[in-house]
Amino acid sequence: MSQRLPSLLLTFVCAAGAQPTFYLPEHLRGGEFAAQHPSLVPPPHLAGPKPSFIDVPVDHFNGGTATWKLKYWTTTSAEWSAAKPGPIFIEMPGEGAAGGPPSVRKGSLIDHFNGVGVGLEHRFFGTSIPLNSSTTKALDAYLSVQQNLADIVFLLAHIKDAMKLPANHPVVSLGGSYSGASAAWIRMLYPSQITAAIALSPPIRATLDFRAYDESNAAALASPAPSCRDQTVATMRALDAAIAADEIKTMALFNASHLHATPMGLTDFLYGIADAAASPVQYGQKAVLCSALAAALPAHPTQDEYVEFYANWTLKQYGGAYFHGCFYNSDCMRDAEHAYPAESARSWYHFKCSELGYLQTATPTPSSPERDGVNPSVRPSSLTVATLIAQCNYIFKRETHGVNATQLLGAAIDKFNHKFGGADSSAGLFATASKIGFFDYSDDPWRTASVLKTTRASLPVHLAVCDGCGHCGSGATPSIAKEVAQIQVQLLTAWLKTT
């Protein structure tokens, strides 16, 4: 372990393994990829504590009396007592259905600090739909990062009151990915209510053109040897050519013929193709793609051989219904205003299309391909800001009336980053923030939207470096997972002492 000042970047090195702290989204669980990596899939649902509900304002900021029932769970560690209560640990809600109370297993932070765990379901995800409406009008009015954070502060006040805890009782926010960014944002926005935060793989910087996601995937696939990246690039260029020559035939190879007849079907198809290659990298299992490329392709593949290989591999890894869910179907999301569970996909796209961006575009071919630092794209080349903005407008039935939709989203993203600071610890609310631990992993393509360095000891940035260290620790060995946990304990021990 080495500490590099002034960036306060702690780096630990390990070999790749499989100790994830993050589960695959539902649309990636239909094939061999999930079956062969069971630790990436949540365990079967077991009967557990029933959730509680609290009436929460639909709109925390613009008045009105409307409320909705927020679903939440609480659980206490074995050693917790009213005489000596440990801190509250709030597990920030993510962009999907909540599964139940936080874990208090031995070794967890809640267990270590004899704390209370609180979990909840994010508004407009799962079955938590305020006003029972996911229309564009409802989402525009009531789905935002700040409405979610206000829900949590409201809930925490209720829990403290119910447990007879003082208003200043310490609270730690925890999360990974979007919920990791939320853990940091809530500490910034409500420092008097949130004592400290632990944020894993947090895309804290909203961004319009997130081509860095593509560049990071290409870099990860080039290690330990460039052959995997080069073959993936060749596969994507073969797919570009095949789609241009015969879109219907190419879609049929992926069991996606139904998308051809829809207005956004090609964009949906391209995004699914891109995700199929990106997901093994993101979840710490890039060898699944690299080994298949090495084993299945001849020495000098033709365009048809690349395309046929990738179609067969995609359906094998993610199942024959990969393109038949809502996540890669803009028509499904467009019509999902009253249709659980498709509403969750619609809600996440609304976040992307209205406030956070994260539009995962293909890296344009540089004018000088040999230029240092440029990785060729491992996504279909037609995934551009323009095509993804058009998809946003279609899903949410937005008429631009001559207004530049790209500029509108860019302005919303700039406003968001101006408030919270993006990844710049000297800007916005970030400038006065403290007691936030940022944890990232070297192969995670979301890392470029996280905090790469800070100049304050109260905002430590930790990077786990290994060939295969993916999102939220997926692909990291038990030893590196243990080391990360130890650092978190050290940080919280120090920070909670000062409250």
Tell where the protein language model's regions lie, with residue ranges.
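Catalytic-loop region of hydrolases
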Residues: F12, G17-G119, T135, Q490-T499
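Glycine-rich "HGGG/HGxG" loop immediately N-terminal to the catalytic nucleophile
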Residues: F124-L139, C472-G475
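Alpha/beta-hydrolase active-site loop
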Residues: D140-A162
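Alpha/beta-hydrolase fold nucleophile elbow
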Residues: L165-G176
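Glycine-rich nucleophile elbow surrounding the catalytic serine of serine-hydrolase chemistry
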Residues: G175-W185
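Alpha/beta-hydrolase
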Residues: W185-S354, Y358
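Small-residue-rich helix-loop
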Residues: E337, P341-D414
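Short beta-strand/loop motif that positions the catalytic acidic residue
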Residues: F438-D440
